[in-house]
Amino acid sequence: MNNLFFSKILRSDNIHFVGIGGVGMGALAEICIKLGYKISGSDIKENLITKKLSVLGAKIYNQHCANNIIESTIIVVSSAIKEDNLEIIYAKKLNIPVVKRAEFLSELMRFKYGIIVSGTHGKTTTTSIISYIYKEAKLFPTYLYGGRLNNSDDYGNLGNSKYWISEADESDNSFLFFRPIISVVTNIEKDHLESYQGNFKKLKESFIKFLHNIPFYGYSVLCLDDIEIKKIIPLINKKIVTYGFNRNSDFCITKFFQSNKKIIFIVYIKHQKRYLKFVSNLLGKHNALNITAAITIAIKEGIKYNIILNSIKKFPGINRRFDFINKYDLSNLNNKKGTITIVDDYGHHPTELKLTIKSVKKIWNKRRLIMIFQPHKYTRTKYLYNYFVKVLSTVDILLIMEIYSAGENPIYKINSKNLCQSIMALKRSHVIFIPNEKFLFKKLELLLKNNDILLLQGAGTIENIFKKLTSKLLL
């Protein structure tokens, strides 16, 4: 890959990433290191990503400070970073360009064969499956996504071919920077409405614009099961390929079976009049849809069937996407006999919660379900409050942690205590407010008993709870 070519495009050698410890930012920084750029970055917490980047040669700062950017010629910012960040303020004073991650990535992809995945749910899983198939097909893609493959530190890599595969985030409308050859939309729901003046119609209009960003020779891959996608299809004047359980889909899932370890499903390929059977370690109908989106692209792009089939079968999954571990010993926690099953899931939108709860109940029917939930963002909790109440009332015992702010300011009356009270009013679940970690572990000591299912759900610091809990309970 010609580093000089990219230098001419970006006119920059020293790139600084604000919020470099995030998965998406870290993956992009790693790719830039491999392209030959001098990389620095700041994040308030050291993690596995910043450690890896440091080993690769990046200069990492564990605080945000104006001095961090003195040698930088371009500043790349995460969508989680606010305008009042010291480094951003100082960069603007020095007339150093400050660009969003999506804008920067879109420039790298400008002359490449881009495949971009968007949608409210399933972006990371779908993107990682597409990337995995392309790797197995020896197409050597560049790829990056917002998660980490299980049993590895793989969340992005620089390839040496024309293919660039990434997910795109609609949270701040920055997905409109991309001009891919192939675009994917998995679904459209109310989320990130704070970026759209609380107006769902404006969010849908942005998705329509995104789908029109492909060239005349490109195409979009859309899930026909999604109500909102079906509504906007007549408004799209570009080539469309559909997938889903819907019988009118171009790639139609005709049969689906799930055990507690895998899913088996059959896809009918309309233009080939052919049925293909797939087996995956991922669970749930929603994952059958994510997989079928990837299958659609792979078949359309001419990848051999046996490579696709084997890739789907081998795909290890993404960290914290319905990870579960059976037989955790209770004796180390509360001196009780027996074991429990622990499920860890990243989902933080009520639809994601609903799907996870449904999958848990289907796999472990009649077992008591105890759920720890950490709401993510005040704005999401505000706009989807009633939906959260409805979904969260379906578990046996619910423990709700404080809202993870993700940098947002508190909103009056939007808090976990009030959410608990609203759920308790339905009188369906036993609900407990969790003010801190110490209180949580004390409650778990009292509550957990043999054969329970413990579900940890959320995108914030709850991941650390899972690590501490499993270190105590693992047989």
Curated annotation (Swiss-Prot):
Q: Identify the domain of life.
A: Bacteria
> Could you mention a single GO BP entry for this protein?
peptidoglycan biosynthetic process
Does ATP-binding appear among the keywords?
yes
Q: Does the keyword tRNA processing apply?
A: no
Pathway stated in the Swiss-Prot or TrEMBL entry: Cell wall biogenesis; peptidoglycan biosynthesis
- According to its UniProt record, where is this protein located? Cytoplasm
Q: Which GO terms describe its molecular function?
A: ATP binding; UDP-N-acetylmuramate-L-alanine ligase activity
**InterPro entries named among the record's database cross-references:** Mur-like_cat_sf, Mur_ligase_C, Mur_ligase_C_dom_sf, Mur_ligase_cen, Mur_ligase_N, MurCDEF_pg_biosynth, UDP-N-AcMur_Ala_ligase_MurC
Keywords attached to this entry = ATP-binding, Cell cycle, Cell division, Cell shape, Cell wall biogenesis/degradation, Cytoplasm, Ligase, Nucleotide-binding, Peptidoglycan synthesis
As recorded in UniProt, its EC number(s) are 6.3.2.8
User: Major place of localization?
Assistant: cytoplasm
Which residues participate in ATP binding?
A: 119-125
GO CC, any one term = cytoplasm
Q: Which reaction does it catalyse?
A: UDP-N-acetyl-alpha-D-muramate + L-alanine + ATP = UDP-N-acetyl-alpha-D-muramoyl-L-alanine + ADP + phosphate + H(+)
Q: What HAMAP family does the annotation carry?
A: MurC (MF_00046)
Protein family membership:
Belongs to the MurCDEF family.
The function of this protein is:
Cell wall formation.
**Protein name, entry field:** UDP-N-acetylmuramate--L-alanine ligase
Q: Which gene encodes it?
A: murC
